C-alpha cells in the first residue's frame, strides 16, 4: 500500500490561474494513516498579485503577514516541491481538493517552471475526502456527524464537521484543515471500511476507468444542489472527444432506447431525468458494488435481477453505443464552433503542453545561479516558459533583467492591477475596493467588529499598492 499526503492551501484569491498560494500545509501518512512527516510554510505576496479581501479574512491573513514573511512565493514553492519529491509515490488527499487545491497546485507549478501534473503522474494518485465523506454517510448512515442546513440537507463544511466529530480544528489555516481532513479520513476508514477501500481503487483515472468498464453494474453518487443523489449504472461508451465514461441509468428501461432512430434518440437524451450520465473517472468517483442497492429505494423496488437484465441489454447492444458516440461527437463539434476564439493569456494555457525537450530541462533552471537563469531561459523552445522565467526574475531578482524586459513586465502588471474593466479574470485594485465596500456594509449590519477592523487594514494595504503602481 502507498503512503498518503493530506494537503491544503490558503490562497490570495479563489481564482486558480491568477491567485497565489500564501500558506501550505501537508502531512505524509502511512497506509494506517499514522503521521510520518509534515510540511508547513507561509510566504509573502508576490508583486502584481492583488488579494481578495474575503480570502484574507477567511484565512485570517493580515497585510502585515503578507508583507513581512521571510519566504517569497518562489522560495516556498521550491521547498514544497523538494519535500514532495522526497515523499515519492503517494496518494494525495484534500478537502474538495479536486475542484480547488489540485487546480491551484497545477497552475502554481506551471507558472513556476515545474511539471504541473505531479499529483497524478509517475505513480502518484489523488482522491478527495469530501467525496469520501458523502459516500460514507450514504452507504453507512451516521458515519460522520454533520450540521443540517435550512433546507434539511447535510452540510459538508470542514469547519463545522470537525468539532461535531470530536476533532480539534484550527479552521482555515492550511495545517489546521490538513489535520482535520486526516482525522475525518480515520473515522471513515474505521466506520465505513468498504467505502474507504473502494475509494483507493478510483484515485487513479486509468484504474477508475477500468473499474467502470469492467463492472456489469455499479453504484455511484453525485452531489446536486446540496443533496447526495445515488445511481446504479452500467457503462455504455467513452465520450469520443472528452473521454469521460458515459453510463446508462438503470432505473430507466433500456428497451425503450436501444432501437431508436438516431435523431429521436438525440432528443430523448436531452430530456430530464437523464438516461445517460457522465461518470468523471478523473474526479475520484466512489464506485460500490450492486449489493448496496437496498440503500436506494428506487433501485431496490426494481430489484437486482431486473437491474442486471437491463445492464446486459445495454452492454450487448453495440449499435446503441455507436449511436451515442455519434451524437456526442456532433454535440462536441457544435460546441467547438461556438466557443470563444479570444486569445488566452499565458497563465491560462496549462493544457497546451510544452515540448518534451523543454520538460526535460526544466530542473536546470532552478539549479542555475540567479545570474545564469536569464541565459538559461533561451534554451526553452516554448515562449511561455521564457515568459514565466522572466516573471520569476522580476519577482526575485529584478536587477538582473534588462531595462527592456523589466519595463515590459512591470508595465503589463501596472495595466492589469489598475484596470477598471471588470470583465478581466484577474483581481484588480478597483475590484478589491468594491469588494471592501460591500463587505464593510455586510459586517457593519452584523456587528462583526473584528472583521471590520481587519477590513480597514486590508483597505490601507490596497491603498499602498495603488500608490505604488500609480507612480510606476
What are these regions (language model features)?
Residues 11, 45, 98, 128-131, ...:
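Short, flexible loop/turn elements at secondary-structure junctions
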Residues 1-114, 160, 165, 172, ...:
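Conserved non-catalytic scaffold segment of RNase H-like nuclease domains
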Amino acid at each position: 500500500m502507498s503512503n498518503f499526503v493530506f494537503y491544503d492551501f490558503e490562497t490570495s484569491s479563489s481564482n486558480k490561474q491568477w491567485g497565489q498560494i500564501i500558506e501550505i500545509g501537508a502531512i505524509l501518512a502511512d497506509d494506517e494513516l499514522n503521521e510520518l512527516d509534515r510540511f508547513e510554510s507561509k510566504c509573502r505576496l508576490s508583486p502584481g498579485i492583488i488579494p481578495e479581501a474575503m480570502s484574507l479574512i477567511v484565512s485570517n491573513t493580515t497585510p502585515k503577514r503578507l508583507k513581512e514573511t521571510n519566504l517569497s512565493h518562489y522560495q516556498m514553492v521550491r521547498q514544497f516541491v523538494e519535500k514532495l519529491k522526497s515523499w515519492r509515490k503517494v496518494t494525495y488527499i484534500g478537502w474538495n481538493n479536486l475542484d480547488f487545491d489540485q487546480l491551484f497546485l497545477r497552475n502554481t507549478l506551471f507558472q513556476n517552471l515545474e511539471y504541473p501534473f505531479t499529483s497524478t503522474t509517475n505513480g502518484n494518485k489523488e482522491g478527495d475526502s469530501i467525496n469520501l465523506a458523502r459516500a460514507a454517510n450514504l452507504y453507512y448512515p451516521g458515519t460522520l456527524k454533520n450540521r443540517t442546513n435550512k433546507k434539511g440537507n447535510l452540510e459538508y463544511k470542514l469547519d463545522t464537521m470537525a468539532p461535531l466529530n470530536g476533532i480539534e480544528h484550527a479552521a482555515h489555516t492550511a495545517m489546521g484543515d490538513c489535520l482535520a481532513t486526516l482525522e475525518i479520513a480515520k473515522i471513515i476508514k474505521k466506520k465505513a471500511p468498504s467505502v474507504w477501500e473502494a475509494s483507493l481503487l478510483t484515485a487513479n483515472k486509468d484504474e477508475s476507468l477500468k473499474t467502470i468498464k469492467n463492472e456489469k453494474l455499479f453504484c455511484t453518487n453525485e452531489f446536486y444542489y446540496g443533496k447526495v443523489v445515488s445511481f446504479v449504472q452500467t457503462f455504455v461508451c467513452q465520450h469520443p472527444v472528452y473521454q469521460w465514461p458515459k453510463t446508462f441509468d438503470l432505473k430507466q428501461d433500456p428497451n425503450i432506447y436501444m432501437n431508436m432512430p438516431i435523431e429521436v434518440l438525440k432528443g430523448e437524451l436531452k430530456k430530464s431525468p437523464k438516461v445517460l450520465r457522465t461518470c468523471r473517472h478523473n474526479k475520484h468517483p466512489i464506485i460500490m458494488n450492486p449489493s448496496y442497492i437496498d440503500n436506494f429505494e428506487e433501485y431496490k423496488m426494481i430489484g437486482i435481477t431486473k437491474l442486471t437484465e437491463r445492464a446486459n441489454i445495454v452492454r450487448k447492444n453495440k449499435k446503441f453505443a455507436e449511436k451515442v458516440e455519434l451524437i456526442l461527437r456532433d454535440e462536441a463539434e457544435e460546441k467547438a464552433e461556438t466557443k470563444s476564439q479570444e486569445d488566452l493569456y499565458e497563465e491560462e494555457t496549462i493544457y497546451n503542453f510544452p515540448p518534451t525537450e523543454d520538460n526535460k530541462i526544466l530542473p536546470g533552471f532552478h539549479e542555475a545561479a540567479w545570474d545564469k537563469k536569464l541565459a538559461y531561459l533561451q534554451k526553452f523552445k516554448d515562449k511561455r516558459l521564457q515568459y514565466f522565467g522572466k516573471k520569476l526574475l522580476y519577482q526575485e531578482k529584478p536587477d538582473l533583467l534588462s531595462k527592456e524586459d523589466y519595463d515590459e513586465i512591470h508595465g503589463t502588471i501596472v495595466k492589469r492591477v489598475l484596470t477598471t474593466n471588470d470583465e478581466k479574470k484577474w483581481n484588480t485594485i478597483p475590484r478589491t475596493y468594491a469588494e471592501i465596500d460591500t463587505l464593510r456594509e455586510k459586517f457593519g449590519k452584523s456587528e462583526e467588529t473584528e472583521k471590520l477592523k481587519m477590513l480597514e487594514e486590508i483597505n490601507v494595504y490596497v491603498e499602498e499598492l495603488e500608490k505604488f503602481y500609480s507612480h510606476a
